[in-house]
Amino acid sequence: MNSRPLLLIGAIALSACTSDKAPSSEAVPAPVEPSTPATAQASPWEQAKARGLVFRGIGNEPGWLVEVGAGETPALHAELDYGERKIDVAHALPLTGATGYSGTTGDGVEVKLQLLREECSDGMSDQAYPVSAKLGVGDQTYAGCGRFLQE
């Protein structure tokens, strides 16, 4: 008996069971989540705290915000009139006999931030804050609310 036909049939059958593609030794990678900084999803209050600020305040009509850095003579940054005007005090001084800061901008404008620990509502969102804030910039006064961030 000739075994060649049997070997030929076995080889054909075996080749039918294999794929044209060689098996991949690489695993299919898991989907990659978009890389976004944690602060992109955080609230403005959490972002300010993460930047090391000690106070953040906001107000309406016109819209404004103020942020105060850490230290004995912290930087004070404010965005006024819905962000149309920005001011910076490089080294604000603590108020004597009150909670707050005062200083002068680089172009000579007097700035005073007075803070009072009392419940405050911004009037627009009905969000309650633990601090009322009054920001004086030159002869203009802005009223609003805020919170100390590092307590």
Q: Which positions does each model-derived feature cover?
A:
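Short, low-complexity, Pro/Ser/Thr/Gly-rich segments in the mature regions of secreted, periplasmic
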Residues: 142-150
